[in-house]
Structure formats: C-alpha cells, structure tokens
Amino acid sequence: MITALLQCNPVTGDIRGNVEKISQAVRDAVARSPQVNLCVTPELALSGVNPGDYLSMNDFVEGCRKGLDTLAERFKDGPELLVGAPVESVYNASLLSNAAVHVHGGGWDVVSRKIRPKSSRDPEARFFDRGVSCGILTVEGWRLGVVLCESDTEAEFWTVQGTDHNPLLDLIARGVDGLVYMTAVPYTMGSRAETEAVLTHVAARHHVHLLSVNAVGGNDGLVYSGQSLALDPTGAVYARGRAFEEDVLVVDMAEGSAPVADVSGCWEEGVLGALTLGTRDFVHKCGVSRAVLALSGGMDSALVLAIAVDALGADNVTAVLMPSPYSSRGSVDDSVELADNLGVKYVVVPIEPMMQAFAGAMKPCLDLFETYEGDFTFENIQARIRGTLISSLANRARALVLNTGNKSEGAVGYSTLYGDAVGALGVIADLTKTQVYQVAEWYNKAKGRTVIPRAIFEKAPSAELRPGQKDSDTIPPYDELDPIIEAVISAESRVPAGNLGPRAEEVRTRIFRAEFKRRQEPQPLFVSQRPFGRAWSVPLAGRFRLPE
C-alpha cells in the first residue's frame, strides 16, 4: 500500500488557500507515484493550527465544511485522503471536534476525533470536545488506526491524563496493521529526538507500521518542524521528512523502502532552522515582505540580522545604525562589516541631535521632580529615540520591525519599553545570552566563513548608554545569570533560591518585577521547553515576600 505524507505549511484561517495547498501536495504525490492509495495531512491542516477564536465563528466552521466538500469533489476518483480539520461535534452541539476526516468517493466522513485530557494544555481546548476513541480506516486491505491524541507525557505516550484510557492499546486490541498519527507538535530544543525515540518504541513493541505526519511552519510564536516519519514493525525509520520545510513523503508500507533525510546534528542547527522558518512565516503570513531592525554592533542584533537575511533575503532587510555619543567606533565599524558581509542595505543615523532636542524640550516637566541615584531617564530616552526611528522606517518601508532582545534581558527587565523593546517579533527572545553566542558560533561554522565578525564575539556586552558602560554593571555576568534564570523558571525544579548562588534572590526578584515589561514586548519565537509568555505567568501587581 502506497501512502503519501503531506507535510503542509498552512496559513491559519485561510481555508481557501489551504485547500489549494493540500490539493497541490496531493497532485505532487500522484506525480511521484501514480499508484498512491492514501494521502495524509497533519492535524488541522485545513483550518491551520491554533485557530483560536476563529473557531467561535459560524462562517469559519461552515467554511471548513465547504473546504472538505471541495476536496471531496476534486478527488472523487482518488486517491483517498485523510485531512485534519475542525468539524461539528456529535457529542456537544456547542463544541467542535478536532478531527481526522476521510475524503473518498466524492464525500467525506469523520474517522477519529482528537482525544484530550480534562486538564488539557491546548489553548483551543475550550472549543473542542474531548473525543471518545480513535477510528480504524481500511484501505487496500490494510487496517489503519487513525490517531489524534494529546499525550500526557512522552513516557505515557497517548495515555489520557487522569484516566486509564490508552487509545493506542485500544487500537492494538481491535487489530490494526498500522497506525497513522496526525499531529501538530511545536518544535522545542531536543523534543523531536525524544518523540522519534518514543515512536520507535511504540512501533517495535506492538509490531505495527507507524506513519507520523507532523505540521511544518511558523504560527505566531510557535514553529513546527515537520520531520514526518515512517517506521516499520521493528521500529526502524525508513523515511523521514525534511526539517523546517514542506515535503511530500511517499512510502510503501509493504516494502518499507524510501530515501531517509538527514537528521539535524546539533541543537544549534535545529534552533537556527526554527528561528529562520518562524521569522519567514511570521512576516509573510502577516502579508508583509520586508523587515527592518536596529543594528548596534552587539551579538544580539548581529544574529537577528543573519537570521533575517536567511529568512527573507538580503534585498528585503534593512539595518539602521543609530550611534550616540557613547557608542564606540568599533560598534559602528563592526555593524558595517556585518551588513556588508550579508549584502544588506543600511543607514547610519546619529542620534545626538535628537538627544539634545529631547533634553531641552523635556526640561520643564522633568524639573518638577528631583533626580536620584540610578536615574535612567536620559538613558531610556536614547532607547526610545531609536525605537521611534526604527518604527518610522517600518511605516515608510511597509515592513515589520524585528526585535533583537534575548531571554536573559527579558527575564530581568534589562530593556526599555517603547525603546529597544519595540517590534513585531522577538526573533531570539527565547534564547539566553549564552545560547545566542553558541548559535552565532554555529552559524559562522555552517556558512564556512566569518560572516559575523570575531570582534562582535570578543567585546564585552554593553548597551552603550553611558561612558564605559557594560551590561555586568547592572546585572550579573551572563555566565552567572543564565543558569539562575533557567533554574527559576524551570517547571521541574523547586530549588531554594539560596542554592543558586549569592545573587539568586536578586535575580528572582527582578524576574518577578519585570513581568509587566514582558507582557508588552513583541511576540517571541518559542524554542525552549519553558518560555516566557507561553509557559510562565506571575501577577503584574504581586509582591513575592516570604515570612522571616
């Protein structure tokens, strides 16, 4: 039996466009193998992943139904399709089902409805029913169990949390030749290797063929890596979809032979692939083609510029250098060298005249209050001047601003709202400063040349908002700060702050106090297991204070 795994990159909400994308993938599969019997999409391929409150709109749900009708008519003579789509629930009239829809013979019917635990982590859980069981589809004499299920943990794969119900064991007991796992699992560092190990175990333990079809593409802050899989009953992977690209994987379960794609060799490569795809899709799915960013001469903006060029092309990226009287000559020179290496157009706009104009214009209101030790007013004005300039350029260029802040800065609030915190997308907002340097080193190695100048690696990190300033004047050195941040926000650890070093309590307090900034900063691209903005929340107006 020949099956095509359609590793699609849908645009959420664009049902018309997604119908065409699925249709083209089916045609590509048929062109490669005219005998293809079944084509399978990822979960929610018709609507797009994470549709949110689109699901509350009747015309959107009706549009999904019409999309299925179109596919049924278009492929009434074959091949058969399994399409991930939202459909009306048969259990609760006020809800929908996240379903696997069998399209065949000019019509369609629901095979499986996604099973989820009561305490689902899925933000769309309020729109969907919990499902009951996974269905079996028979194609060319093969009995295929069709699985959509939110797993509790990888160790309890496909076990519904809080119950003894295991959809996988239910299917095995009913007798199947293979499993088709339709999914949309967001990328996080290291997660894909873990998932592949679990799938290998499942196929080998139950001696069944296993086809896993995963979504690919960026959707707001989430990135889906693709890397769909075909495994034989021994657990051997005999076909693997490309990472971070659309792909059509045609496999013959009877023979179990197909080319196997290369596997990512290191976490830095995976992160770079995710951030590049996430940036490209965020910009393009917002209906824009260009991006602008502030280039400071530091590592954060250097890496974001490199990612932007890979994602959008050098012709669609503009860098702005905005030196102040406190900027070093090296910062400007290093920025120019980087822009030239990447072939990016840039402009240099000194901000000293604007700093002087702001200081004069603001004097009457600032004089109402006395200054104080640690008064950052004029340092923040520099950042806000830069934020105004880069935002204005984005207006004129019809572009999006790419923010260059990292997770370490975001954790402790080392940024200026409406200044260096402006932007549409936080490209590296889920990478610590340590990780930023590691990914940048890998980037240069992968390119086979020194694109990011060595001087940027070697200089001490600094916002250059006052003479001789270094980041470590205000916050702990990053090699000390980053482990504390990871420990504080880790879901697994409840490590007493005192066990994390002498500055741990200070860092934890800053993390809590900076929540109001993080809530106003650009959408991050999520790549870690525990990102701010998705898996973390503390009160804005709280005060974390323990009894003595």
Enumerate the predicted regions with their spans.
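ATP/NTP-dependent adenylation/nucleotidyl-transfer catalytic domains that generate, transfer
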Residues: G13, H207, P233, P259-S296, ...
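Enzyme catalytic cores with a strong preference for nitrogen-chemistry domains
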Residues: M1-A294, L305-A314, L321, Y346, ...
